[in-house]
């Protein structure tokens, strides 16, 4: 299936305190209706007042985990994004707290693939994380070692 078609018209809130990240994500998602927020307060107000299919949430600068709680309450798919907090603990926390994916900023250029995986998994009734581990297995093994999933108790499939 064409990635753009699956994402076309989706309303996505992009939250990050770095303007260049907001610009890049908007450029990568022209098929979506994007709204941007640079602060926790701005994102919280948008989530409370508007409808979104999905929110891409920076973990560090904008209190991403607090925003994820709001997303879960509003049934908005939450995707965690980070540059500095790429750790097994944050991946596990994102998974446990109900995020649909965890995207390292250095993999941001593949955002359409990650988002498409989420919608494909949703259509198939599978865990949102089923393809994530396949796509980022090499990246994570290089960064954390070959047994990182087992050591941190991941059970997705």
Please annotate each region the language model reported.
Residues 19, 36-54, 62:
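Acidic, metal-coordinating helix/loop segments flanking the phosphotransfer/catalytic sites
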Residues 56, 60, 68-71, 75-88:
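A short, hydrophobic beta-strand element within the central beta-sheet of small alpha/beta folds
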Residues 115-116, 123-157:
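CheY-like receiver
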Residues 19-35:
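Two-component/phosphorelay signaling modules centered on CheY-like receiver
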Residues 10, 14-17:
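Acidic di-acidic motifs
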Residues 24-29, 46, 70, 93:
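Alpha-helical interaction/dimerization surfaces of two-component signaling modules
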Residues 66, 73, 85-104, 109-113:
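Alpha4 helix (beta4-alpha4-beta5 surface) of REC/receiver domains from two-component response regulators
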Residues 5-7, 73:
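Short, flexible coil/linker segments at domain boundaries that flank nucleotide/cofactor-interacting
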